[in-house]
């Protein structure tokens, strides 16, 4: 669901940067004594997403340049902290993820996020479309552009960070981008765009699980 708007608003690099910044969230959580890495990743991801959003609004440089600098710097800081403490080997599995490690309370959290996403999408999808087409025109229609952008960025950060433990840092961007990009090539309108993206995401997920189960 979120991937369609990520692609539509040309934020593919944004989600990729969030995924790579997870290492810093883990490192800071470990340094501060937070036992659950998911919690530290979500907190750091929200801060990182908001920081990127604020800097983008100031137009200090091109969006791709800003995201690249922050993603690289954040990843480097995370690797440095984890390597210095000798803990990197404990978290290296997060690079590729492990869906078998999912626990019941984490499934519950994912379901809660899914419901929140659906509610937000029903309320905000037309507003986000208007913002992506012409922000100034959206403001003239009394759409709170900054608020919509902030909520969307926070929602992406939460989804990305919660999914990393099972999808992996290296593949988290593909989870959002590939189904939406595939759907965009065959869709004739926004309704089909969202429906096909969901179908592609579900099909690829089930196919991937099936192939890995029968070949391993």
Functional labels for PLM-detected ranges:
Residues 63, 67-126:
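Transmembrane helix-bundle core of multi-pass membrane transporters
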Residues 92, 96-101, 200-216:
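C-terminal binding/interaction regions
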Residues 4-87, 183-196, 211-216:
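Short loop segments and helix-boundary regions at transmembrane helix junctions
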Residues 1-2, 43-51, 77, 111-120, ...:
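Generic alpha-helical transmembrane segments of integral inner-membrane proteins
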Residues 19-21, 46-47, 147-158, 170-190, ...:
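Hydrophobic alpha-helical segments embedded in the membrane of multi-pass proteins
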Residues 107-176:
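Helix-loop-helix "hairpin" substructures at the membrane interface of multi-pass membrane proteins
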Residues 7, 22, 93-95, 132-136, ...:
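Re-entrant/interfacial helical elements at transmembrane boundaries that shape
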